[in-house]
């Protein structure tokens, strides 16, 4: 993982997103529980688009910005929730006979082949910006429905609390700082990617959340689950707080 971080970091340096000094500082002071790219976004050192471009070069996969809320419901219905949540991927369009799946990290060829076999459809993978797939999975596929952040923002504009331009800035900031629970668990060092992928296959057949499934099966402790959930809550901005701050003439930074 350290080698992968260094490689991604070097790509970001080469692309001019950060300096060598900033990379060294990030590797030294990176917050526990965040991967290097995610930490750089969280710290305001790079944008989600700069990270997507670096990951695109690293994985040789096309990067693009998506609006998960604009995906047709018919397309969502054609892609099972079990696959979406397992592979952390969203169907965004079809290109001829191929289904295009957006993810925030590259989906490996073996997994792409497995999805293609299940759906009996050729698959193409593209990289979305950090947070875009996360908010899309929560909106379209999550069992647990909280306040819809986009609706909160639209309501604030309709009420005259925010201008459309302010809302766009807030949405960009909010989305780029959303983190998948599995990413935090991996970054905390509690579970490696290969083990997590195997466990996700088992979880497909249950109604439990990933955290609950891992605790029930003694993969992680309740304390570890709590630590990961608290970190996720701490690093993810609240939409209502962002709206209050901006409408009160505060600056999002």
Specify the residue positions occupied by each region the protein language model found:
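Non-catalytic accessory regions
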Residues: 1-253
């Amino acid at each position: 993982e350290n080698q992968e971080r260094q490689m991604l970091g070097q790509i970001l340096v080469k692309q001019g997103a950060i300096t060598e000094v900033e990379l060294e500082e990030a590797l030294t002071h990176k917050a526990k529980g965040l991967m290097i790219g995610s930490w750089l976004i969280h710290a305001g050192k790079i944008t989600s688009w700069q990270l997507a471009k670096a990951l695109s070069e690293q994985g040789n996969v096309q990067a693009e910005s998506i609006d998960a809320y604009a995906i047709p419901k018919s397309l969502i219905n054609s892609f099972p929730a079990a696959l979406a949540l397992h592979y952390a991927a969203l169907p965004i369009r079809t290109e001829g006979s191929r289904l295009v799946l957006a993810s925030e990290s590259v989906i490996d060829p073996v997994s792409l082949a497995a999805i293609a076999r299940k759906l009996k459809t050729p698959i193409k993978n593209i990289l979305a910006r950090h947070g875009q797939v996360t908010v899309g999975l929560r909106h379209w596929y999550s069992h647990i429905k909280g306040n819809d952040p986009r609706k909160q923002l639209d309501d604030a504009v309709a009420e005259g609390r925010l201008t459309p331009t302010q809302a766009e800035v807030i949405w960009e900031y909010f989305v780029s700082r959303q983190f998948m629970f599995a990413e935090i668990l991996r970054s905390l060092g509690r579970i490696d990617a290969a083990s997590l992928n195997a466990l996700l296959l088992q979880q497909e057949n249950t109604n439990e959340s990933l955290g609950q499934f891992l605790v029930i099966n003694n993969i992680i402790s309740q304390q570890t689950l709590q630590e990961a959930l608290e970190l996720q809550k701490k690093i993810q901005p609240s939409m209502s707080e962002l709206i209050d701050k901006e409408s009160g003439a505060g600056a999002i930074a």
